[in-house]
């Protein structure tokens, strides 16, 4: 199974890179290939619907809010996220309302027809390895 891990992090923080490496390493057990893409830097030729599994990783979360950036859903729709695509949603635990933030991201993506089979809130690399083992 081919999978794509689309992450959203404007700051390109070191913690995000650490979590991405742990996710990718653990996902290789169930997936033939995992491609990592920065959601904010997707090219016009990057199409998500060619992958069997799509991981949406929101690595940035405002400290005091539970609303996801509306640009995330818009970017994913523009690059081929359509009804029937299967995948999971991962977010980073930061500040207040982290679980509600995850639910709001899931609701926004499910309204597009994205079928979510797994979700998690990551706190550290161990959480990322556990979540990566469930990709696919």
Specify the residue positions occupied by each region the protein language model found:
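FMN-binding flavodoxin-like domain, especially the glycine-rich phosphate-binding loop
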Residues: 2-136
